[in-house]
């Protein structure tokens, strides 16, 4: 009889422990969903898209930006190019025309021979 009641107690403990572990697991699962972080996006702080009124946009603007012929830098295009810029551009040497010297990397790994 004592063995039978002992078995009932063991089975009862397993059932109670299973219910407790499910409750704890459920509690952990719900707390993960409620987690907030300082890095979360705040919807109210987002910038809302705005439209530019048509009066502000000029359809036939005479000031377009284009690349400079020598430098390639974009800026407001001008109908007359500066003569000084053209003269100076012709005088300067191109970077492509400069000589470059390269040291072979294979020399760094060689052992120096000592002549005696």
Curated annotation (Swiss-Prot):
Pfam family, one: LEA_3b
Family of the protein in this entry: Belongs to the LEA type 3 family.
Transmembrane segments: none
Region entry Disordered, spans: 37-116
Name recorded for this polypeptide: Late embryogenesis abundant protein At5g17165
Bias kind Basic and acidic residues: ranges: 55-65, 83-101
Record lineage: Eukaryota, Viridiplantae, Streptophyta, Embryophyta, Tracheophyta
Taxonomic superkingdom: Eukaryota
InterPro entries from the UniProt entry: At5g17165-like
């Amino acid at each position: 009889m004592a063995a039978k009641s002992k078995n009932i107690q063991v089975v009862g403990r397993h059932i109670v422990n299973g219910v407790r572990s499910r409750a704890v697991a459920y509690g952990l699962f719900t707390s993960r969903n409620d987690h907030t972080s300082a890095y979360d996006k705040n919807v109210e702080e987002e910038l809302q898209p705005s439209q530019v009124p048509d009066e502000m946009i000029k359809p036939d603007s005479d000031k377009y930006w284009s690349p400079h012929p020598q430098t390639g830098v974009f800026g407001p295009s001008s109908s007359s190019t500066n003569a000084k810029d053209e003269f100076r551009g012709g005088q300067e040497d191109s970077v492509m025309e400069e000589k470059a010297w390269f040291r072979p990397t294979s020399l760094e790994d060689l052992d120096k021979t000592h002549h005696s």
